[in-house]
Amino acid sequence: TKEFVDNIKSAFIEDIKIRIKPPESHTERGLRTKITEIQEGVIYQENGITVLAFNVFHGGGVKHAFGYKIIYKNRSVVISGDTNYSSNLVTYSKNVDLLIHEIADAPDSIKNRSPKVKGLMDYHTTPEEMARIIKEASPKFTVLTHILLLGGISEADTLDKVKSLVNNSYDVEMGYDLMGIDVKDEIITYSLDYSDEK
């Protein structure tokens, strides 16, 4: 993480030099960073909120891929991060209130003839893997996000496929921009609309 952040700063060094001189005269205070490398386990605990990081399998030799579990007032949310099927993710997701999980789909005909597409699917969670995760983890509600759909497959097709594979026994929705989610006794999703705000 430190190397990544340092490289981002290096990429923008010329812009930074311009912005700290007149007429803009910005300070470099906003560029200061405090990097904390994480590993599996508790990474934050304050004011009744606990955040756990856990390893997931992103495939293709990717190291240091993490999912996150957030616990607050007997409610729990898991964010999968980039992954395909991961037994560790299932362990951390058991009976959570909300599972926010990535999804990827492509027609078999394209996967079978394109090593690039097959490779992408190996880095991400297919509908079949998603159904397995849902069945094994039994989340109260699942929102599919970080959506990668290739070859003309629609979000509706992929959502229907996942629901069918879990026999429509679990609540699953596709995520979307400005989606709001209330994690209470009943999970409520809604669209945030800021179009009238000035």
Predicted region positions:
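Binuclear metal-dependent hydrolase catalytic cores
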Residues: 1-77, 156-189, 196-197
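Cap/insert and terminal regions of metallo-dependent hydrolase folds
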Residues: 66-67, 76, 84-179
